Amino acid sequence: MRRTQEERRQESESRLLAAAVKLIAEKGANGFTLAEVGHEAGYSRSLPGHYFETKEALLARVVEHITRDSLAAITDPDAEPGIESMRARWGRALAAEGVDSYRTRALYALFLGAMFDPELAKIMARYNQATVSRIADSLREAIARGDVRSDIDVEVEAQALLLFRRGSALVRFTDPRLDLVSILDGYLTQVAERLKP
């Protein structure tokens, strides 16, 4: 069966985004050109320009591509809301892909690139805020269930959890001996104890 033009377009965009993620992971957010993305994806060097027009637009689309699944996966739908849900999901994610996957390395390369690119910084700030909101929602659900104290500052706790997760991954890039799964488990045990009613 012949694919529709829309199906071909979606496949092309998906391959271009995968190529961009790989290049960002290998070279950083500013270390590649649109033409290299086309070449890496097996297309003409001009195709990324046709799809995304500018490198900034491509980076914005890459962030959306990388983060779409990660926002949904902040908590585990099969675990109780709150800390245990995050422990289950984050622990599985770290055990499965660690911080060495192209996707994870690209995400952190984008954070580092945002230090030097104000437009990318705005995009990454929006992603961080969406992540904090997702964590805060999970904590609110845990409060409603009676698993977490109701007098906590949910936004502050959500920020702290995100900072720990992001910071520990950054440190792991420079010291691969770190066992992030165990460190995360220990930290979340302390947080759960501190927040319990």
Regions flagged by a language model, labelled:
Residues 61, 72-104, 154-161, 184:
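Hydrophobic alpha-helical connector segments
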Residues 5, 121-125, 129, 143-191, ...:
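Hydrophobic/aromatic-rich alpha-helical bundle segments in the mid-to-C-terminal region
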Residues 1-11:
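N-terminal intrinsically disordered/low-complexity leader segments
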Residues 19-23, 134, 164:
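Short amphipathic alpha-helical elements of helix-turn-helix/winged-helix folds
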Residues 85, 98-122:
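Amphipathic alpha-helical segments used for helix-helix packing
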Residues 64-70:
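Short, basic, alpha-helical segments at the C-terminal edge of helix-turn-helix-like DNA-binding modules
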Residues 15, 19-57, 61:
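Helix-turn-helix
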